[in-house]
């Protein structure tokens, strides 16, 4: 059986509950993917895969369906602890070439910091496969310009969810790329 996704949507959520597992369930509910049996996969954005809206993607899902996703997930039960989960995306200019999805799930990073880091990871992975020369010690903004000026990377972005832990509760954050046939 061969399955190469043709569509993808991005979603995120946060959940809080006294139980760890229930906080994860609530994050899935906020992301609107709680009805799926999620199977996590690694980080390839398939060639010619179309990005669709969450609403459009949800229409094609059935309760209990085996659903493939790249998921970043983080949890804490520490009051005031900042957590984040990010999916970074880097897409090549040539749609017949695969792109990259990266997962990042830090403690102590803001939503912006986590998102930029995940985006940087994905773009750097793609740049190395495309033979783009760059200095890995340069900051993300400078490398992003090099990647895009090469003409080989057309777009990069991220989806990120962050939250602070609350006293007496588990807090879980997720960010997902849901891959569809």
Curated annotation (Swiss-Prot):
One function term, GO molecular function aspect: arginine decarboxylase activity
Catalytic activity from the UniProt record: L-arginine + H(+) = agmatine + CO2
Coiled coil location: none
Keyword Lyase tagged: yes
Residues with PTM Pyruvic acid (Ser): 43
Cofactor(s) needed by this chain: pyruvate
Parts of the chain that traverse the membrane: none
SUPFAM superfamilies per the UniProt record, alphabetical: Pyruvoyl-dependent histidine and arginine decarboxylases (SSF56271)
UniProt KW Lyase keyword: yes
GO biological process annotation, one example: arginine catabolic process
Keywords recorded for this protein, A-Z: Decarboxylase, Lyase, Pyruvate
Family affiliation: Belongs to the PdaD family.
Protein name: Probable pyruvoyl-dependent arginine decarboxylase
Originating species: Prosthecochloris aestuarii (strain DSM 271 / SK 413)
Lineage of origin: Bacteria, Pseudomonadati, Chlorobiota, Chlorobiia, Chlorobiales
Underlying gene: pdaD
